[in-house]
Amino acid sequence: MAQENTLHCTRAICYSGYRDGQDPSGEILPTYGQVKQDLMILEGQWQSLRLYASDNHSDTIMNVIKSENLSFDVMLGAYITAEQNNPHCPWGGVYSDEQLAKNVEHNQVQIDRLISMANSYPDIVSCVSIGNEAAVGWTDHLVPTDRLITYSKQ
C-alpha cells in the first residue's frame, strides 16, 4: 500500500458490479469481462473506487485494474461482522455468545485478507477501510471501537 501521509481528494465512487442473479455470498460473482466492461465505463469519470470487502470479487476487480492498466486507485475494505450485541438495532443485532466468538474469528480472517490484498496491489490500494458502519449505534454488525483500532494497527 502506498505510504503517504495524507489522503488526496478525487472523484470517487463505491463499486460492487453485481448483476441480476449475482450477490456477495460468492455463489455467482461478476466475471473478469463484466468487471472490465464496468470499469471501462467508469474510467475517465472517476479516479477512485471504494470496495467494501477483500473477497474473491475484489481480487477480480484489482486484477482487472492491474491487467488492463486502468488508472483507478482503491479504498479496499474489510467487511466485518458483529463482535458485540446491539439491542438498539431496529432489525436485530443480538447474537449468541457462540456466534459472536465465530464472528471474531471471521473478522480476523477478513483483516488478514485485507492486509494480503493491500500488499499484493501496493500501486492500486491507496487506503483501507475496516468495517462498514460497524461503530454506529443502529448497526446489526457492531464492533467495539477498541477492536477497530486493534484491527487498524495490524
Task: Please identify what each model-predicted range represents.
Residues 33-57:
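Catalytic domains of carbohydrate-active enzymes, especially glycoside hydrolases
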